[in-house]
From Swiss-Prot:
Its EC number is 7.1.1.-. The chain crosses the membrane at residues 15-35, 53-73. This is NAD(P)H-quinone oxidoreductase subunit L. It is found in: Cellular thylakoid membrane. It catalyses: a plastoquinone + NADH + (n+1) H(+)(in) = a plastoquinol + NAD(+) + n H(+)(out); a plastoquinone + NADPH + (n+1) H(+)(in) = a plastoquinol + NADP(+) + n H(+)(out).
Length: 83
């Protein structure tokens, strides 16, 4: 049984629910954590204490998505060059 035949057998309400779950899951695990990584990298040295508190709260909230991308993103400092 191919994928198209499987989709045609499901009721339309079920497809809407699956699409909604996929959108929420994609937002929670992919979109927001990547945007948060970009924001942290851009503003790391210029954040106020309240902005930093808010960012840390968002990191706590979106921790599962942050863990998904942690092995692939390197935000360490560049260092002093050749020593």
């Amino acid at each position: 049984m191919d994928f198209q035949a499987l989709l045609s057998q499901l009721p339309q309400e079920t497809l809407f629910v699956l699409l909604a779950y996929g959108a929420v899951l994609g937002t929670y695990l992919i979109a927001v954590p990547l945007a948060l990584y970009a924001w942290i990298n851009l503003r790391w040295y210029r954040m106020s204490k309240f902005e930093r508190l808010g960012v840390y709260g968002l990191v706590f909230l979106f921790f599962p998505g942050m863990i998904v991308f942690a092995p692939f993103i390197n935000l360490r400092l560049s260092g002093q060059g050749e020593v």
